[in-house]
UniProtKB/Swiss-Prot annotation:
Residues 4-123 form the PINc domain. It is an enzyme of class 3 (hydrolase). Pfam families: PIN. SMART domains: PINc. This is Ribonuclease VapC. Signal peptide: none annotated. Mg(2+) binds at D7, D98. Probably forms a complex with cognate antitoxin VapB2. Its cofactor is Mg(2+).
Length: 132
């Protein structure tokens, strides 16, 4: 049963195996983690603009083959609209992709694992953890 949605920065930490303590948390939660298709898009973007795109794409694809990837659906978009409107009213907007990822995790009842809690803590009813 899925419990956690990994943010892009957490995926990168696990792939790079730094910091080391993240690997034990990752391994302890095998089978309980997923990523959003939004995170997948961010990973491909990072690989494409890197010095070694082909190598980095292969690493990403190998890593993702071991995780569940959740597709972004209309119900997630509805949460996106709600979150963005609330943050806008407060004058506390966060990055567009971060809102999509937060909406995806919140609407699925998942805990978002990120090293960017300063922004994600602004999102009402989003459960978060930092494994770093």
């Amino acid at each position: 049963m899925l419990k956690y949605m990994l943010d892009t920065n957490i995926v990168i930490y696990v792939i790079k195996r730094r910091p080391l303590e993240i690997l034990s948390r990752f391994n302890q939660n095998a089978g309980k983690m997923c990523v959003s298709s939004i995170t997948v898009a961010e990973l491909y973007y990072g690989a494409e603009k890197s010095e070694y795109p082909e190598r980095n794409i292969a690493v990403i694809e190998d890593f993702l083959s071991r995780l569940t990837i959740l597709d972004y659906q209309p119900k997630h978009a509805a949460h996106f609209g709600n979150i963005k409107a609330e943050l806008s009213k407060q004058g506390k907007l966060i990055g567009e992709n971060d809102i999509h990822i937060a909406a995806h995790a919140r609407s699925e009842g998942l805990i978002l694992v990120s090293n960017n809690l300063r922004e994600f803590e602004r999102v009402i009813a989003l459960r978060t953890e930092n494994w770093v």
